[in-house]
Amino acid sequence: MAKSVNGQQIIQLFEQFSPKAYAVEGDKIGLQIGTLNKPIKNVMVTLDVLESVIDEAIEKEVDLIIAHHPPIFRSLKHISTDQPAGRLIEKCLKHDIAVYAAHTNLDVADGGVNDLLAEALELSETEVLAPTYTDPLKKLAVYVPKEYEEQVRAALGNAGAGHIGEYSHCAFSSEGIGSFKPLDGAKPFIGEVGELELVHEVRLETVFPKSVEKAVINAMIKSHPYEEVAYDIYPVEQTPAEKGLGRVGTLKNEMTLKEFALFVKDKLDVNGVRMVGDADSMVKKVAVLGGDGNKYIHHAKRKGADVYVTGDLYFHVAHDAMMLGLNVVDPGHYAEKIMKEGVTRKLTSMCNDKKFGVNIFVSETDTNPFTFL
């Protein structure tokens, strides 16, 4: 049976996938309008929050909007309902629609905007283009009755623990005898108050990135049968995986720059692309960064990319790329619309695992401001 859910629960789940810690300094992320302390039945995922998007949300009885681009990005000196920004906020509050933004944290996240773009372009052997965050690793050791081992193991893995490279749910267990004596006031799951108890237990060990520590601990406690869970958390010295903006990967087949530009147009489903470089030059290694990636052209060059795919390319930055000998294909900022389907799939899967009774769907409003002739 599906469980009712509130906004806090939805966002806590979402932030296991796209932690706030991944956002670059100063980014405007998180809850921007309304409250999460309310029941949620309908969630709409959008790239942008425009008044037309809010009108769609009202029509579809949306309780929560998850957006990539924050509607409140620049500081507001006042909120006037005579102005577009004020009207948008007023409509959200009037119709009890909460708006949550995941911006650069969603760019950085595994399976986020840049991974979705790299996947659409069929890149293999991908790595981070511009590191922005190192997520320190920690190790958890928890003591579990043997018959509850699999329950706790699954809960930890589903909360984000045990990810090593391309593997998830990695853990190690060893068996032993645990001992404890419940004191007055205790309500032991096993044993009697005042009597020493010896229990066949398993020491279950796994690693997790610091960014999901809260979720991992909550999952452990919720899935564990004991009222007082015995566990240890300590840092480990392995070098954690770098997180960051953009991706660099390799095409399956080498092609000319012109062929690649048309490939980008098709795969990202955009109305047109701009191209910088020799149309007949061959490309194989690709750097991609969703949105405005102007300041990362040198990162793309240092990574050995033959071509850099990014949006909002400036005139003089295009000249810089030419002088660097770096080809560029610009599909526009709206190529990030790919996040709508990607986030909807991911969050739907996570909510289904929790048996949350919530509908998650993609906004159908086209927020691209440009018309191509």
Swiss-Prot record:
Residue positions binding a divalent metal cation 2: 69, 333, 336
Record's subunit section: Homohexamer.
Record's GO cellular component terms: cytoplasm
Gene Ontology terms for molecular function: metal ion binding
Family membership noted in the UniProt record: Belongs to the GTP cyclohydrolase I type 2/NIF3 family.
Source organism, top-level taxon: Bacteria
Name of the gene: yqfO
Protein name: GTP cyclohydrolase 1 type 2 homolog
Coiled coil: none
Organism: Bacillus subtilis (strain 168)
Signal peptide: none
Keyword Metal-binding: yes
Key words of the record: Metal-binding
Pfam families referenced in this protein's UniProt entry, alphabetically: DUF34_NIF3
Binding site for a divalent metal cation 1: 68, 107, 336
